[in-house]
């Protein structure tokens, strides 16, 4: 397998990874796991950060990337954070003319996926 290059600002993409992985650690199970998966698509690379944490109810998914939105404000206070992380992630990915998505199941976990253009 040869490397696949993407067109991206490495510092901003590092921030995307840090935010997504931190969320997985923050809301994951004590003995849980995090998977980072890479898929070679036609013109893009799809990258997924998946955990086996608490999951997110469907009613919250459409608002997750809003500034200051928190699924459970009381839990967020215990875990720390500002409610800006996912909004920043979305902004960075969209600044690269790409997309981010989320799917989640309660008590099973969440998967955040984003694309980057291959270069």
What are these regions (language model features)?
Residues 3-8:
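Conserved micro-motifs of the catalytic ATP-binding
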Residues 31-43:
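Short beta-strand/loop element within the Bergerat-fold HATPase_c
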Residues 51:
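Acidic ATP/Mg2+-coordinating residue in the GHKL
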Residues 97-98:
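Conserved glycine-rich
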